[in-house]
Amino acid sequence: MIRELDRKPMNLLVLGASGGCGQWLVRLARERGHHIRALVRPATPFNPSAGIEVIRGEVLEEGVLDRALEGCETVLSALGIQRKTPWNPWSALASPPDLATQAARRLVETMPGHGVRRVVAISAGGVGESVRQLHPLLRWLIAHSNVAASYRDLEGMEAVFAGSGLDWLAVRPTTLRAGPPTGTIQVVQHFGLFSHISRCDVAAWMLAAAERPEPFTERTPMIGTTGRRRRKSAWSAKRP
């Protein structure tokens, strides 16, 4: 971990800045002294604090990433497929079914021209080979709902980055929750029914990764919080 006094401000581009994890990325990066540029869709409400540069545009549109990447050092991506009713796994998709994959292709094509080599993206626990680490009921839910579309897209995103030659990392969080930071984040080997992590903790982990000077070696770590939530509080938790 980089010491507070040793950390130098970076120029960061945040994709998906208006979403749950994206808003935390912007907020925490600003608190840590970084310079943030947020790419946000034209019609999406987004009112960040002072000092955040906002570019309006669609990530898949020609020329948008060229504008957004100018002068940046690292990309933080919180992009992913959205469902019309986020808490309902069977809800219809509200995003293109290959949003993250297509955005990754655009990044791979565009980043080298701007001298940007590092990207840290959000994937999901259970993507790719980590499906073996999922509880059987979670595997069933993913396979028999529209969550499967998100997982196919994120697997495609990871594959694009894997063949890019970039310094990339795709973090695979367990179930995302609302809530304050815990600071008890760890790489986990099992994704159970009650495994969870707050969006704030995911954002903090991504920023810490982006600040490391050494190249990434572990490309797709699965992360969660330490300890287990009691069964009663797990069922009574608010929907994310």
What role is predicted for each listed range?
Residues 10-32:
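N-terminal Rossmann NAD(P)H-binding glycine-rich loop of SDR-like oxidoreductase domains
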Residues 99-100, 153, 171, 197-208, ...:
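Substrate-positioning beta->alpha
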Residues 129-131, 180-184, 209-218:
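Glycine/proline-rich active-site loop of Rossmann-fold NAD(P)-dependent oxidoreductases
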Residues 158-180:
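Conserved beta-loop-beta element that borders a ligand/cofactor-binding pocket
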